[in-house]
């Protein structure tokens, strides 16, 4: 299968886009990949917003977003912008708009860019199931055009940029009923708005396709690029990358690295934000670590250096590569088996005394037990002997090759028979990555391949401590949804809409529930996006009023206005009520 979203899945080529100016910052074209973040302060609090924005600018943030949930909030953007400019800070400001076209019109007077969510800019989500006739659908689009046109015309006349940012969890009922809760629906939602803007000769557009599920996120961005390529060469708009509700700590960093890093490897992405449930300033250095290897100053497009076969999978629809079935020391690999975690021999045997402490994070095999066949996927002489093997074998890429792991393993998957299994590696040059780059690089390389459905086992070579290497391997499997070994969390990064201390609440919820393998809990700051953005969570903890929490089962609110100090205990009670609780070991 040919790649339709990038020139080649086997080498780096940055997607060519037009330049869009966001104030004094160029996005796309030949510009660097720009780093963004979002204020957590209340937009009505001018001093707090200015202080936080100055800290972000000092940290290297190039574009700063603020929430503007009503026209009154948006009006205070005038004061924030004036104070920042008076302080000598000229970082462009972006107003984040949901549900309120009048807030967008007010905000556009004062900031350099407007972000709209096409799922709720006009449509009010009611979770209704209905069939739309073509005529009814057209009427809805006409209503959308009527509401959206004034903002487009204002932005065009005043030099404002706009991001059309679809979110997986907040698609409109109209889109859901026609396209489903899918990447196709996310793309169509954005294209509808973009077509209206283009018809009005407005082109200062940036797009995003965010989701908390990284497989959905990667598929949606790829599908967006494929769709824009098909629509014509003048649909060459820049793209902003982000994983919504990635969480905090190492989990949030790994999840962001999987989603954002996968797309950067594909040459997609002109701006990015790492959304962490932490102070906003802590997002910036992580964003730079992710983007640095792909900045134009660091690398150029790779030349064609070997014959490039068709892909062995559909990059727009996730499907696990189904290899054969093999048994190694009592551990099954391959067909319908979980992806396994391996570590080098010495580390594996050293960990045997820690089996009880390691629990579900214990590596299942040593590298020696796997007896993997190492090959250069470009070399016919290495691959031909595999055809003669009677049984499925586990194959990996040789260390030391001058290839990036993602491209090397994609090539391997395309060139070997499906019956053979694949051992993924985070790096082909052990020792070449160090410090904080180790988990980000591993998550980018292994996570990208897992999102492509490639891999039957993983080996972390960049981390020398076998315990940490095993934890990292399982955390990457968790982040991609490939294999769950503990509770999973969808946690929003906080913004000016957040109604309680979300960092503290998230930490308490994790401490109480982390042992609940396979249970997915959403921790959301407010009811503006909370119910929609919870995606496929089993339970939700959502701010309903200042320091008051509403609890959800799936998308349904079941408990209301619980004082924050009681809410975690009540969440545990709810999990017990629905039969998902087990006592920690």
From Swiss-Prot:
Pathway annotation: Isoprenoid biosynthesis; isopentenyl diphosphate biosynthesis via DXP pathway; isopentenyl diphosphate from 1-deoxy-D-xylulose 5-phosphate: step 5/6
Classification via SUPFAM superfamilies: Dihydropteroate synthetase-like (SSF51717), Nitrite and sulphite reductase 4Fe-4S domain-like (SSF56014)
Catalytic activity: (2E)-4-hydroxy-3-methylbut-2-enyl diphosphate + oxidized [flavodoxin] + H2O + 2 H(+) = 2-C-methyl-D-erythritol 2,4-cyclic diphosphate + reduced [flavodoxin]
Record Gene3D superfamilies: Dihydropteroate synthase-like, Sulfite Reductase Hemoprotein, domain 1
Needed co-factor(s): [4Fe-4S] cluster
Record carries keyword Iron-sulfur: yes
Residues annotated for [4Fe-4S] cluster binding in this entry: 492, 495, 526, 533
MF term (GO), any: 4-hydroxy-3-methylbut-2-en-1-yl diphosphate synthase activity (ferredoxin)
Matching InterPro entries: Dihydropteroate_synth-like_sf (IPR011005), IspG_atypical (IPR017178), IspG_bac-typ (IPR004588), NO2/SO3_Rdtase_4Fe4S_sf (IPR045854)
Example GO biological process: isopentenyl diphosphate biosynthetic process, methylerythritol 4-phosphate pathway
First-level EC class: oxidoreductase
Cofactor binding: number and manner: Binds 1 [4Fe-4S] cluster.
EC annotation from Swiss-Prot or TrEMBL: 1.17.7.3
Keywords: 4Fe-4S, Iron, Iron-sulfur, Isoprene biosynthesis, Metal-binding, Oxidoreductase
Family: Belongs to the IspG family.
Biological role: Converts 2C-methyl-D-erythritol 2,4-cyclodiphosphate (ME-2,4cPP) into 1-hydroxy-2-methyl-2-(E)-butenyl 4-diphosphate.
UniProt xrefs under HAMAP family: IspG
Protein name: 4-hydroxy-3-methylbut-2-en-1-yl diphosphate synthase (flavodoxin)
């Amino acid at each position: 299968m040919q790649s339709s979203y990038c020139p080649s899945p086997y080498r780096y080529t940055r997607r060519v886009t037009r330049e869009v100016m966001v104030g004094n910052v160029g996005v796309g074209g030949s510009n660097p990949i720009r780093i963004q973040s979002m204020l957590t302060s209340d937009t009505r609090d001018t001093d707090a917003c200015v202080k936080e924005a100055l800290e972000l600018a000092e940290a290297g943030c190039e574009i700063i977003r603020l929430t503007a949930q009503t026209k009154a909030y948006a009006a205070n953007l005038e004061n924030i912008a004036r104070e920042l400019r008076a302080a000598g800070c000229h970082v462009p400001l972006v107003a984040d708009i949901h549900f309120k076209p009048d807030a967008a019109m007010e905000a556009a007077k004062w900031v350099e860019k407007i972000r709209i969510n096409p799922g709720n800019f006009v449509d009010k989500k009611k979770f209704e199931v209905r069939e739309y006739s073509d005529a009814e659908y057209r009427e809805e689009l006409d209503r959308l055009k009527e509401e959206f046109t004034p903002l487009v015309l204002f932005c065009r006349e005043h030099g404002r940029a706009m991001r059309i940012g679809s979110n997986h969890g907040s698609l409109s009922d109209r889109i859901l009923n026609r396209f489903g809760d899918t990447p196709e629906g996310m793309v169509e939602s954005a294209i509808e708005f973009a077509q209206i803007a283009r018809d009005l000769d407005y082109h200062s557009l940036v797009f995003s396709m965010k989701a908390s599920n990284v497989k959905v996120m990667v598929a949606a961005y790829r599908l967006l690029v494929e769709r824009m390529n098909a629509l014509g060469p003048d649909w060459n708009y820049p793209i902003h990358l982000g994983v919504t509700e990635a969480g905090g700590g190492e989990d949030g960093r790994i999840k962001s690295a999987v989603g954002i890093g996968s797309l950067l490897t594909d040459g997609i992405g002109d701006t990015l934000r790492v959304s962490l449930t932490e102070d906003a300033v802590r997002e910036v250095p992580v964003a730079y670590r992710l983007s640095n290897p792909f900045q134009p100053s660091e690398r150029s497009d790779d030349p064609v250096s070997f014959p490039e076969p068709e892909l062995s999978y559909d990059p727009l629809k996730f499907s696990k590569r189904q290899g054969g079935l093999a048994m190694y020391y009592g551990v099954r690999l391959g067909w319908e088996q979980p992806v396994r975690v391996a570590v080098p021999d010495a580390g594996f045997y050293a960990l045997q005394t820690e089996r009880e402490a390691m629990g579900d994070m214990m590596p299942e095999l040593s590298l020696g037990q796997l007896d993997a066949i190492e090959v250069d996927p470009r070399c016919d002489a290495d691959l031909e002997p595999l055809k003669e093997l009677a049984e499925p074998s586990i194959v990996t890429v040789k260390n030391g090759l001058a290839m990036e792991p993602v491209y090397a393993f994609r090539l391997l998957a395309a060139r070997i028979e499906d019956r053979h299994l694949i051992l993924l590696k985070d790096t082909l040059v052990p020792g070449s990555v160090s410090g904080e780059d180790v988990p980000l690089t591993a998550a980018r390389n292994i996570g990208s391949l897992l999102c492509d459905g490639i891999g039957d086992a993983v080996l972390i070579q960049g981390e020398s401590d076998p315990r940490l290497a095993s934890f990292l391997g399982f955390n990457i499997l968790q982040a991609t949804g490939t294999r769950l070994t503990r509770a999973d969390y969808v946690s929003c990064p906080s913004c000016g809409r957040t109604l309680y201390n979300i960092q503290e609440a998230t930490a308490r919820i994790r401490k109480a529930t982390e042992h609940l393998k396979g249970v997915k809990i959403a921790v959301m700051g407010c009811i503006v996006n909370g119910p929609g953005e919870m995606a496929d969570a089993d339970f939700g903890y959502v701010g309903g009023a200042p320091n008051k929490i509403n609890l959800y089962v799936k998308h349904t609110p079941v408990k209301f206005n619980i004082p924050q100090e009681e809410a975690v205990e009540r969440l545990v009670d709810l999990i017990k009520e629905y039969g998902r609780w087990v006592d920690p070991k």
